[in-house]
């Protein structure tokens, strides 16, 4: 929790003094916050906490005109993947998604750009799922 949730809480607390109406906060959660994962219980728990923090903060800051949203990536290729998994798991990474592949970082980035833009001026408390078609509730 120290890394994944406390850091967001304290960073947000420090940044709020400098934010004006029209500002946007975008947090990163994960598909595991919605699906769970028996091997990543600690990680899934922190990502679920980020989701709840995002929604609660959005309701808290709406009257100040500050939007708060999240992005929940699914399996995305990063240097962490080959460093964390054995070769067999790396070869199959993302293949269980409806699109049958893992995403690339450049496929996630536009979600952040959208949420930061004025095109999302009426969007707050929401989470965009960039996960190759895995439909999750919540």
Label every model-predicted segment:
Residues 1-9, 26, 50, 99:
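Catalytic Tyr-X3-Lys loop
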Residues 17-18, 59-63, 121:
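Alpha-helical segment proximal to the catalytic Tyr-Lys
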Residues 30:
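Residue(s) in the substrate-gating loop at a strand-loop-helix junction
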Residues 35-41, 63-64, 100, 118:
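Active-site loop immediately N-terminal to the catalytic Tyr-X3-Lys motif
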Residues 12, 46, 54:
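Active-site helix of classical SDR
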Residues 35, 112-113, 124-138:
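Short C-terminal tail/terminal secondary-structure segment
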Residues 34, 51, 72-83:
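Short, flexible catalytic-loop segment of classical short-chain dehydrogenase/reductase
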Residues 97-108:
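A conserved structural motif in NAD(P)-dependent oxidoreductases
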């Amino acid at each position: 929790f120290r890394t994944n949730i406390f850091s967001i809480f304290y960073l947000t607390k420090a940044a709020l003094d400098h934010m004006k109406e029209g500002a946007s906060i975008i947090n990163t959660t994960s598909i595991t916050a919605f699906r769970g994962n028996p091997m990543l219980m600690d990680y899934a728990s922190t990502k679920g906490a980020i989701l709840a923090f995002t929604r609660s903060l959005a309701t808290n800051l709406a009257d100040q005109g500050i939007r708060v949203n999240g992005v929940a990536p699914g399996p995305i290729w990063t240097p962490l993947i080959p460093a964390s998994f054995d070769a067999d798991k790396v070869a199959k990474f993302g293949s269980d998604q409806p699109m049958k592949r893992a995403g690339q970082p450049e496929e996630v980035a536009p979600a952040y750009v959208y949420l930061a833009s004025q095109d999302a001026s009426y969007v707050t408390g929401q989470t965009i799922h960039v996960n190759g078609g895995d439909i999750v509730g919540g």
